[in-house]
Amino acid sequence: KLLEQLGFVGYDGIIHWVIRKDCDCEEAVAVRESERKRLERQERRSQEEKLLRAGVARRYLNATVSRPESVRFIESFDVGVGAGLYYIGGVGAGKTSEASAVAKSFVWAGYSVVFATSLAMLDAIRASYDGKGGAGIDKFASADLLVLDDLGKENANSWALTTLFQVLNGRYENLLPTIFTSQYTIDALGRRMSRNGERESAQAIVSRIAQVSEVVNLGSADRRRGRQT
């Protein structure tokens, strides 16, 4: 199909012809559509890579926010306030999915986000002490948003609780928000962390969590199995 053309005289005195509008012939439309899809795939991969680098698991890349408390947290977020969320629920209640969905919003908004289980965080910090290239305390203590998944699964020894306190106290003092997920209420978490006699550290940790966290109870329904646990 012939295209409308526009001519102009350049400084060289020669008439230059340019296409006035995109060709709407079938072949050109197909090329443009193919390019649009390619750019969409490229952007999707880029967004996925950002989430994976932040620690969001591939299984939860498509997680969506389902709770009004999560929506409020996202919409009213102020990095200098330090308020966070504490998702509690049984196995399979959707804690990790909900926390991942919230984390996604902040990754895409350009905030530094670190998502890790408490076990993985402690392993990474220990590896940094052993010279194995793991992430040190500062990575977790200084991120704009930290998501600690499955809190209460970690060992309750002196090193683990002292390290956990260092991370959380650093965030507490610098008004940096933390999102927690756990099978335990905050009081039950304190008792669990005290099980090996580290009562003082346990109390210091749960006191800070209680002060800055809105508790969101996701119930006990196991979504993975479709039955009550």
List each model region and its residues.
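Short, flexible, glycine/charge-rich loop motifs used to bind or transfer phosphoryl groups or to couple energy/partner
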Residues: 13, 75-76, 135-137, 141, ...
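Short loop/turn elements that form and flank the Walker-type P-loop nucleotide-binding site
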Residues: 80-81, 109, 140-143, 171-175
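A short, basic N-terminal segment
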Residues: 1-70, 226-229
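Walker A/P-loop nucleotide-binding motif
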Residues: 82-100
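Short glycine-rich substrate-engagement loop in P-loop NTPases that contacts/grips substrate
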Residues: 71-74, 88, 103-145, 155-162
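A short, well-structured juxtamembrane/interface segment
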Residues: 67-82
